[in-house]
Amino acid sequence: MAKAKGPTSSKSNKPASPPKPSAPAVPAAGGATAAEGSPRTIASPPSDLNKVVKRTSWAAGDVIHRIHPSKYAADEFNPGPHGNSRFSPICNAAGEPIPTIYGGSTFECAAMETVYHDVPFAAGFKTIAKRKIRHHHHSQLVPSAEMVLANLSNKALRKIGIPRADLIDTEKDLYPQTRKWAEAIHAHCPDVQGLCWVSRQDDTAQAVMLFGDRLPSGCLTHTAPSVDLVVDDATYSALVQLADDIGVKITGK
């Protein structure tokens, strides 16, 4: 007996191929997912910051090394609202700019956080133009009284609820979000006079950022005259040595 023929069709009887799945979204650190071409989103500050922020102190008499534009005096706070740093410019709860000073526990830290901040983590020959260093001073400040600072070290950040990768180790595209944390700490922790963390650029030292409206007038004094980074021979030699340590050559005039 001949086998019965099945129904004929001009189309193939093969099942249609399922559509290719799209690549899964990669979650950003902290659990948020970044849309393509836009910065990822970090966690927002919790409402109970005053309870979870660990305090640390900067002792009276301990030097803060500051590298700053020559238009500012050694102890003069940056008034804001201009600039683009990790924790400044920021405003208080009334929307008024909070004056700030950045510094480090060593000269090398201050230089890495300013002069060499944008040197890439890449092997090979790297340069920085000498003109970018000009018109900057190195100042050494000491507080006349102990300062209370928010501790942003790894252990302390676990209690706050944000990893270092999201607050300290981010690139500039996330600075608008990291500044929200500085504003929140200022708003919720009335005793805190600034922030302190292990420097991203020099992890052998501490970086600090001070809230100018939380420090009494005259509490910062300089222990030595401010010196020009290029004009002062000893300071420029130290910069050249640090440049060599990180594989950078200072070029130009």
Q: Model-derived features: where do they sit?
A:
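Active-site and NAD+-binding cores of ADP-ribose-processing enzymes
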Residues: 2-15, 20-88, 122-253
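Extended catalytic/binding region for NAD+/ADP-ribose chemistry, centered on the ART fold
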Residues: 89-122
